[in-house]
Amino acid sequence: MKKRFFAAFLACSMVLGVFSGCGETETTESQESETLSTGETVSTQGEEKDSVVIAMGPTSEPEAGFDPAFGWGAGEHVHEPLIQSTLTVTNTDLTIGYDLATAYSVSEDGLTWEVTIRTDAMFADGEPLTAEDVAFTYNTVKETSSVNDFTMLDYAEAVDESTVVFHMTREFSIWPYTMAVVGIVPEHAYDSATYGANPIGSGRYILKQWDRGQQVILEANPDYYGEAPKMKRVTILFMEEDAAFLAAQAGQVDLAYTSATYSNEAVSGYRLEAYQSVDNRGFNLPAIASGEETESGVAIGNDFTSDVLVRRALNIGVDRQEMIDNVLNGYGTPAYSVCDQMPWYNSASQVEYDPEGAAALLDEAGWVMGSDGVREKDGVKAELHLLYSNGDSVRQALTADFASQMEALGISCSMEGVGWDTAYDRALSTPLLWGWGAHSPMELYNIYHTIGDTGSAQYSPYSNETVDQYMDEALACSDLEESYTLWQKAQWDGETGVTQEGDIPWVWLVNIDHLYWVREGLQVAEQKIHPHGHGWSVVNNVDQWTWA
C-alpha cells in the first residue's frame, strides 16, 4: 500500500508540476498556488471566478486527438465535442434540441433528411461555417471513421449555404441523436494528419494547449454565436484515480473524478457529488444450448443459461440494492435494462428481488437442490462460469457478489478475469460482465437485434423475430418521438420481449453513479444522466459552471 501511495504521489506531483509551469501558455498569478506558513498548498484558481481545473482519468485523453472523424465526441464514450459545434444537442431529458441546426425534416420514405443551419456561426480562424462544411464533415466521417457505424448514410450534400441534405441507405429515425455528437470541421482547413492536434472549430471553446499524457487547456471562443461561456478557461489534467485524490487533498484541482473506493474519505474544502448515470453493468446470458460454432470456430451457447426459466431465476434472484450498498458503497441505482430512465425505456423491465421465486423457477426447470447445497439435473451440477474484464476492480467485485448470491440459490459459480482481446469470443458461450449505456436507442438494437444472416445478436446468442421487427419499425418511423413506443415494445409488448416475462437474454445489475470531488464554491450546472464512461460527459455544460 505504501508503494502504491508513493507512486500515486509521484504521478500527482509530476502532473501538477507540468500544470504550474509548462509550455506555451503563460502562468498568471491567479493560476499559481500559494504556500501557507504551515506548508500546506492551496489553489487560488477559484479567485479568477472564470476558470476551472478538472482531473480526469488517463483513458479520457483522446488518442487520435480532437478530430470527430476519429472518435472525438462520438467514440465509445459519447459526449459533446466542445471545440466543434454539432447540428443538434440532447437536452437534459434526452430529447433533441438545436445547436447549428434551426430546423430539420425527413422525407416520407425516411431516406432523406434536410437540415437548415444558422448563418452566424464562424470557425475560430474567422471563416464562416456553411452547409458545405457540414456535408464535408459527414462524408469524411463516413469514409474514415473506424469507431462509429455510418453505414446508414449514403452521402451528404449542401444544396445552398444554409441547407444540407443527408441521403440515407436505409430508414434511420434516430438520426438526430447522431447529429448531436458529430462535431463540424472546416473543409478549407482540414487535414486528417494534423487536425486532431490542431483543431479549428466553431464551438464554445478553442484548444489552447495540449501536452500529451498530461493536460489540455481550453479557452472560451470569443466569437461563439451562442451565449458566452461563463468559464473562460478550462484545464483538464489526465491522472490516475489515486493521483486525482491526492490532487484534491492538495487543493490543486477544482473537480476530480473518483469512485466508491474513496467515497468514505473526507477532503477539506470539497464536497462529494454523485451524478446519476445509465453507465450500467450486466451479464449476457447465452440463450441457446452449446454445440454450435461460428464460421471461425468459436464455441456458441451455454446449456445452463439456454433455459429461459434459469435466466428468469437469475434475474429475480439477485439483490441489486445489496450490490449497490456493498460494492458501490451506496453510489448507484438498480439496473433493469440497458436504457433505464431514457425516453425509450420500458418500465416493464423492472423486477423485485425474489429469492423464493427464483428458487421456485429453478425447481420448475428441474434443477433440484442437492445435499451439498448445489442443484442438480439429470446428474449434472448447476454451474455458472463468470467472466469479467482484467484490471477492473469494480467489475471483479460485482462478479464476486453476483456469484455469492447465485451460490445461495444452489448454483456453483467460478470466476475468471479476461482481456478484451478474447472476451468477445468467450462471451458467445460464457456470461461476461459488460458495461453499456448510451444517449441513443441504437444501443438496444446493437445488443438485441439479429445481425444479418448469422441468426443471432452480436454479443450473445439470442434472436427474436418480433423484437427485431419492432426495432426495424422504430428505425423506419417518420416521427422520432413516436419511435420511442416501438423501442419500448421491443423490450416488452405484453407477450414477448427481452424482459423478465419474455426472453431475458441479459441480466442487468447496477447503474454506477459517477463521483467527483468538487471544490466548495464551484457551482456545477445541472447534469444530464451520464452515459457509459467516467470522463468528458461531466463537462458537457462546463460553459455554464460558475463560482459562488
Across the structure, where does each feature detected by a protein language model lie?
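Periplasmic binding protein-like
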Residues: I54-M56, G126, Q249, L255-T258, ...
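N-terminal lobe/hinge region of extracytoplasmic solute-binding protein
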Residues: A55-V106, I200
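Gly/Pro-rich hinge or "lid" segments in bacterial periplasmic/extracellular proteins
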Residues: N91-T92, E171, T178-P229, R233, ...
